[in-house]
Regions:
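Conserved aromatic anchor
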Residues: 546-554, 639-648
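Ser/Thr/Pro-rich, low-complexity mucin-like regions
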Residues: 141-174
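Basic/polar, cationic surfaces and motifs that engage anionic cell-wall
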Residues: 2-17, 163-251, 256-340, 382-393, ...
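Secretory targeting and sorting signals
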Residues: 1-40
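Short beta-strand segments within Ig-like beta-sandwich modules, predominantly Fibronectin type-III
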Residues: 569-576, 660-668
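Secreted/periplasmic proteins that engage bacterial cell-wall peptidoglycan
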Residues: 328-397, 464-467, 479-489, 728-737, ...
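Solvent-exposed loop/turn segments flanking beta-strands in beta-repeat/beta-sandwich domains
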Residues: 92-94, 553-565, 646-660, 754-764
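Glycan-recognition surfaces in beta-rich domains, encompassing non-catalytic CBMs
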Residues: 45-143, 151-152, 165, 596-598, ...
Length: 822
């Protein structure tokens, strides 16, 4: 295929006239102000798009051959700058430092050293008349003042500082409009209806070796000594040029007959195919008549791929002035065999809302330096927003201006920002502080690589063979084929530190993300409606559950996920989903998640065990109720409810439901509460198992108070009166062996007494048998205390007898009767 020398484009002067007509103002002695026009719509080809005015103001540096300066001065508003010079083949052997003044605060920035600009078109485009060399750009933000110092042994001629005002407008919302790339439909004028351009239609295809003017200069300031790769292959390996290398697509013969009849329409689901004639040749009021011809030979429409195009902001979306670029179609390669990752080296001090302005600024600088268009094929900001770069159809193998000598059959993705760490392979020519690339940026780069390499059938983790197309690229030999990683850093194809150590270190991640299969796929939980419930190493649910999972591969690189139950897919969801509801039959199951990469490759998680439990809990020990210890009154007699609940898979919770509600633990077997005297009380319980199944149980009891007056007395007893006593009275005795005997029928009994520091002790007999001795001594006085209880499995007639012990120094005991439960 043709290099930058070919293609159906207008001659350089023709585009230049269009540019000048857009509003160029020549400033004597200081440079040129170039006004650009840019649309600010959201990516559709709407009629009458708004205009975003973008301008480049060039100010000349003056001084000696080894020192050029621009004194601190006020300027028109700008946000980006770069320093450029006349000959792009001459490297700036020296240091360029700039500082800018904030238009918001009036404060001057610190001095910043600019590195060399290392994204370049191939020789045919670079060596056109009027093309300039330049430094890396600097995003300064809103500014209205600048100062520049350039020092070196011999500085290039024609040094200027180029100040870019990108205007306001553009969108950060992806809007892929396939209609903007549609081919002429039936009934419209086709390429064969138009005259062909004699300058291009019959021109033989050019190769880099056809240009005798190429030379071999030394590397740029940012060059590393060898273009090494941190992962295999360690460096590009020379091989016979006829070999395509692993994972490559052999190029078609340039002499093969190619039909010029395009398809009638573009794929509605695959944006960015060959642009229409009206898009390639925009209607510009000042443009001279240019024959509108399709590319010849017509590039093949990219093959279909499972990988869908990622969302991206179109050129119209970010505000590209299509009348400023070279009119017509760009040059095309055969297919994209390799992706080169770059950074713009413009600093990271930007907001993502600035990204359209940054892209327009880079576009303006590249045009100002004489390039036919923006050099990069795509740009990505730190928020992960993707911007379409060079015109020609995002899906097409557009030859960019990004990796000198290897622009054909590759594409360049530029990460907006600076990602150096100034160690190892990073050049220290620039003092711009680098940062680590964001996860969103790495993900977006991976997404583009997956799409573009997917159309070529090249694995992102594989390699491709590219042939060096420049005679003067340091470290590479013209005409030799080199094996490159399918996802490479700019430094692997050119002597530069780009894309910076911090981004370069992420290329293995990019390869893995782009190639698939999904990594880190695992089930994180299987939830019941109230959340996940574990039982041992597995989960317990009912017949409905929610399966949740995670992956280390970002969601935008997944096309979908499935939940497998016992190996069968039961739920399919989008790649962005991390959960799905499922229905299960009763019993034990295995659950897995299968995630699908955009490439179609899949990964199935390890299985987790899930038991769908539909069986209610049981009560192996039915509830029973007994009298308990504590303070007694007619409204509340202490009782204790006892039971045992169980479930094959385990209990989640238990609760009391009557006569009062109370939350109990899953392991509870008793519940102390109270019951109203002389009233039948129902004590209700609920047990809930891990799956949410419930069971209920209850028991009913009626407590009755028998006062001391109902007992048979022996010895001396004294009646005491107080509102603190049950019924207002109690009986006391300090006589040793004095006794009270109650006869009752019931299943539980409690003896009630008063306590004080002077209280004595009693012996308790049931049915004539000594049960225990109870000492009533207490540091604090307490009335109506159930001090001792005894229960039976069923109600029967019994006797309870208390006998005064006659404790030395404190013989007196006071009793308030007994409580009986039936």
């Amino acid at each position: 295929m043709r290099t930058e020398a070919g293609g159906a484009r207008a001659p350089r002067g023709r585009r230049a006239r269009t540019w000048l007509a857009a509003g160029t103002v020549l400033v004597a002695g200081t440079g040129a102000v170039v006004a650009l026009r840019a649309t600010s719509d959201t990516g559709t080809a709407a009629e009458g798009p708004q205009v975003v005015h973008t301008s480049v103001d060039s100010l000349e540096l003056t001084g000696s051959a080894g020192e050029r300066v621009l004194a601190a001065r006020s300027t028109k508003a700008f946000r980006m700058l770069a320093v450029s010079w006349q000959d792009p083949g001459v490297r700036l052997d020296g240091t360029v430092r700039v500082r800018t003044r904030s238009s918001a605060t009036g404060t001057w920035s610190d001095w910043q050293a600019l590195g060399a600009g290392d994204a370049q078109p191939d020789p045919a485009e670079r060596d056109r008349a009027g093309v300039r060399g330049g430094t890396a750009p600097l995003w300064a933000g809103p500014s209205d003042g600048v100062q520049v110092k350039a020092d070196g042994k011999t500085l290039p001629k024609g040094l200027t500082v180029d100040l870019v005002d990108p205007g306001k407008g553009g969108s950060t919302t992806p809007a892929m409009d396939a209609a903007a790339y549609a081919m002429p439909a039936d009934g419209e004028e086709t390429p064969t209806d138009r005259p062909t351009d004699p300058e291009t239609s019959s021109a033989p295809e050019q190769t880099p070796s056809d240009d005798p003017a190429e030379s071999t200069p030394a590397p740029t300031d940012s060059a590393t000594e060898t273009p090494a790769e941190s992962t295999p292959p360690a460096s590009p390996t020379a091989e016979p040029s006829q070999s395509t290398g692993a994972g490559t697509t052999a190029p078609a013969s340039p002499t093969a007959p190619t039909s010029t009849a395009p398809p009638t329409s573009a794929s509605p689901t695959a944006p960015g195919y060959l642009p229409s004639l009206s898009a390639a040749y925009p209607s510009c009021a000042s443009a001279s008549a240019v024959p509108q011809t399709m590319p010849s030979p017509l590039p093949a429409q990219p093959p279909t791929t499972k990988v869908p195009a990622p969302p991206f902001v179109t050129r119209a979306g970010w505000g590209a002035d299509e009348c400023a670029r070279d009119t017509g179609y760009p040059d095309y390669g055969h297919t994209v065999k390799a992706v080169f990752v770059h950074h713009t080296d413009t600093t990271n001090a930007y907001s993502c809302a600035d990204s359209p302005s940054i892209v327009r600024s880079l576009y303006a600088l590249h045009l100002h330096q004489g390039w036919r268009d923006l050099g990069y094929n795509f740009l990505v900001d730190k928020c992960g927003t993707i911007f379409e770069g060079r015109f020609g159809g995002a899906a097409m193998p557009v030859i960019g201006a990004q990796t000198y000598g290897f622009n054909t059959d590759s594409m360049g993705i530029a990460a907006i920002g600076t990602y150096t760490d100034l160690t190892g392979g990073d050049s220290k020519a620039s003092t711009i502080v680098g940062a680590a690339p964001s996860q969103a940026m790495v993900t977006a780069i991976s997404r583009i690589a997956a799409w573009k390499l997917g159309m070529s059938g090249v694995s992102p983790t594989g390699t491709s063979s590219l042939t060096e197309g420049a005679k003067d690229s340091y470290g590479f030999t013209f005409g030799k084929a080199y094996t490159m990683n399918a996802v490479s850093g700019h430094r692997n194809g050119f002597a530069t530190d780009c894309p910076g150590n911090q981004l370069y270190a992420k290329l293995d991640t990019v390869r893995s993300y782009a190639a698939g299969p999904p990594a880190g796929v695992g089930v994180t939980s299987v939830d019941t409606p109230s959340g996940p419930v574990r039982s041992g190493t597995g989960y317990v649910t009912g017949t409905t559950a929610t399966v949740r999972w995670s992956t280390s591969t970002p969601a935008s690189l997944l096309s979908g996920a499935e939940v497998l139950v016992d190996g069968t897919s039961v739920a399919k969801v989008a790649g962005t989903a991390t959960s799905a509801p499922v229905k299960l039959t009763s019993g034990r199951h295995t659950v897995q998640v299968r995630a699908t990469h955009v490439s179609g490759r899949t990964t199935t998680s390890a299985a987790v065990t899930v038991t769908a439990d539909t069986t209610r809990p049981t009560y192996p020990t039915a509830p029973s109720v007994q009298l308990g210890k504590g303070t007694v009154n007619t409204a509340g007699v202490p009782v204790t409810v006892s039971w045992k609940a169980a479930d094959d898979n385990g209990l989640r919770s238990q609760a009391a439901t009557s006569p009062t509600a109370k939350t109990l633990t899953a392991t509870s077997t008793s519940w102390p509460t109270t019951a109203k005297s002389a009233t039948a009380t129902k004590f209700g319980l609920t047990a809930t198992d891990l799956a949410g199944n419930t069971a209920t149980a209850s028991v009913t009891g009626t407590p009755t108070l028998l006062q001391e007056s109902s007992a048979k007395a022996t010895g001396t007893w004294t009646k005491r009166s107080s509102s603190s006593y049950l019924g207002g009275y109690s009986s006391s005795s300090g006589t040793k062996s004095a006794s009270l005997t109650w006869t009752f029928k019931g299943r539980s009994v409690a003896w009630i007494a008063s306590r004080a520091s002077t209280s004595g002790a009693v012996q308790i007999y049931v049915d004539g048998t000594l049960q225990t001795t109870v000492d009533l001594k207490s540091a604090t006085t307490a009335y109506r205390q159930a001090m001792w209880t005894k229960s039976w499995s069923s109600a029967a007639q019994h006797t309870l007898k208390i006998v005064v012990v006659g404790t030395s120094g404190r013989p007196t005991v006071t009793t308030d009767g007994i409580a009986v439960l039936n």
